[in-house]
Amino acid sequence: MLPIGRWLLVVLAAVACATIGASAAQSGIVMTGARQPVASRVNALATASPDTVTSSNWAGYVVGATGAGTSASTTFTSVSSQWVQPAVACAPGESSYAAFWVGLGGASDTSQALEQIGTSSDCRAGTAAYSMWYELVPAASVKIKFKVFPGNVVAASVKVNGTQATLQIKNLTRRTKFTKKLRISAPDLSSAEWIAEAPSACNNSGRCIQLPLANFGTISFSRAATTAAGHAGTIEDPNWALTAFNLIEEPGVLAGPIAAQASPNGAAPSALSSNGASFAVAWQEAIAPPDQSGSPPG
């Protein structure tokens, strides 16, 4: 974990790259991670009532194990969802990034792990690029060789049984399936997530910067589900605490040539569907950054 500023926390899902700056952005080597207002996040996950917090790189929904039917020691053992791969809008020469995933862990200020699998919609020097990947923090992310295109329907899941993690992603449109089983010594099972993210890039020394968020338009998640303490439910199940995340980029986190082309864009989730299993995340242009002059919210 890397503290940033007064109340921001980074849970790093590391992908090492040779340099930071324009070369990192143009290489297409990015990392995912969790940077959230710590005070807001901790308070939200400590109550059973829904809450909304602001993050510099997450948009979507997170559930924690402090709802009506769980205790602080409850563990989440699976998470899943479907989504439609969004098309990215790229300006000439633009390098920007967006990742979409389901995962377990990574939302706590003490977390050292995050188990996730998903897709990306990136702009690389003005050209759209789409990919699949998985990651078990603190290990580096791994690109999946199967192809994904805008409009494809993707189904993804993460399951953990003891020290074995099973990560699966299907392209239902192209009828391809990837499954990977890995050993993980200390998984984080304290939360489950359905996220659209502005990724970051790291160099070999571990120094990281957040990359500009790509204009992905809107992504629609459906059939979202998770399991905790043997109970299976949707995002809005009363057995766990629900938190919505709004994303507002923080230009101060960016550095060098990347910062010059960045603006404080963002993304926000819609309300959940009536069955608590579907929502959309919409990209938003030039959102005003939150006030950094006072105490953190919460």
Q: Residues of each region from the PLM?
A:
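Bacterial N-terminal signal peptides
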Residues: 9-19
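Exposed, interaction-prone regions of secreted/extracellular proteins
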Residues: 25-291
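Bacterial N-terminal signal peptides that target proteins for export
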Residues: 1-9
